[in-house]
Amino acid sequence: MGFGPYYFVKGLPLYELITHEFINTFVKKGSCYALTYNTNIDEDNTVALLPNGKLILSLDKDTYEETGLQGCPSQYSGRKTMRFIVSIDLMDLSSNLDSKKYKRVSWAFKEKKPLKFDFLLAWHQTGAEGSTMMSYFSGYGIQEHQPKIALSTTPDLRCPVLRSGLLGGEPEAACSAHELFDWLGAVFSHADLNNEPYNFVSTYCCPQPSSVVAQASLCSVTGFLLPERICVLLEQLCRYFDEPKLAPWVTLSVQGFADSPVSWRESEHGFQKGGEHLYNFVIFNNRDYWLQMAVGADDDCPP
C-alpha cells in the first residue's frame, strides 16, 4: 500500500494558515495537518494544525505577549510561567471575516508579530489530487516527500507467548501486555536479547514463557503519516488472518513526534521528560486485539 505524500515548506509565514483561501481549500475540504519542523518544544515556539481545524501554538512568554492573543499558561511551566498555549478554531474564525476576532488574529500574525516556521504539511481528501498543495504553496519552494520504508527480517527470534484473554499474563502460560511492550521496545531498538555475559550494553532478555520464531519481519515507516493511512494499514493487518497463518499475532506501533505541542486529542504535550506519546495494536489470529497507549511521565493519560 502507499502511504501518500507529505510536504515540507521552508519559512512559511504563520499568517498563511489562517487565510480564508487556505481554510476553504484545505481545512474545510478534508483533513489538513501541519507541524513545525526542527523546533524544540522546551525552548522554541511550536505550532500544530489538527484535522478538526484547531491551530495550536506553544509560545514562549515574550512571543506570547508580543502577539497580544488570548491563551492560557502551560501546565508544565512551573511556578513562573514562561510558556503559553494559544488555541485558534479556524472553522469558527473563518465564519465571519469581518469580525473583530479574525481581524485581531490576522493583524497579530501579519503585522504585530509576523512568525515564520519550517512546516511539515499533509492533506487527506478522498478523490483529491495530490498536486493541490504543491501548487498552492509553490511560491515558498515546497518539497514533496514520501515516507521512508525499511524492511528487515530476524531469524530465530525469541518472542513472548501471548493469549488474547490474558491481558495481565499468567505464570508459565502467557506474558502480560506490559512485558510485551518492553520487549517491543527492545526489538525496535535492535537490542541483543540473548543476555550473554559479554553483553555490557543490555542485560534485557525475552520474558517468559517464550517461543522461537523461525523468521520475524519488521517493517518501519518513517515520515509525516496520516491517521487515515494508518487505519488502512490496520485493516490490512486484520485481514492477514483471513487465511490460516502460523503466526499467533502481529503488532502495529505508532510513535508521535516528540516535539509536537499536542499529544492525545488536544491535550498539551509535556516537555520535561522524554516526550513520548505512542500506541500499539496487537492483533491475534482469533481476531481479538489489544490496544496499548502511552505518554511521558508528566503528560495526561490518554482518553
Curated annotation (Swiss-Prot):
Component of ribonuclease P, a ribonucleoprotein complex that generates mature tRNA molecules by cleaving their 5'-ends. Also a component of the MRP ribonuclease complex, which cleaves pre-rRNA sequences. Keywords: Nucleus, rRNA processing, tRNA processing. One of its GO terms (cellular component) is multimeric ribonuclease P complex. It is found in: Nucleus, Nucleolus. Its main location: nucleus. The gene is RPP40. GO terms for biological process: endonucleolytic cleavage in ITS1 to separate SSU-rRNA from 5.8S rRNA and LSU-rRNA from tricistronic rRNA transcript (SSU-rRNA, 5.8S rRNA, LSU-rRNA); tRNA 5'-leader removal. It comes from the Eukaryota. PANTHER family: RIBONUCLEASE P PROTEIN SUBUNIT P40. GO terms for molecular function: ribonuclease P activity; ribonuclease P RNA binding. Pfam families: Ribonuc_P_40 (PF08584). This is Ribonuclease P protein subunit p40. InterPro entries: RNase_P_Rpp40. Component of nuclear RNase P and RNase MRP ribonucleoproteins. RNase P consists of a catalytic RNA moiety and about 10 protein subunits; POP1, POP4, POP5, POP7, RPP14, RPP21, RPP25, RPP30, RPP38 and RPP40. Within the RNase P complex, POP1, POP7 and RPP25 form the 'finger' subcomplex, POP5, RPP14, RPP40 and homodimeric RPP30 form the 'palm' subcomplex, and RPP21, POP4 and RPP38 form the 'wrist' subcomplex. All subunits of the RNase P complex interact with the catalytic RNA. Several subunits of RNase P are also part of the RNase MRP complex.
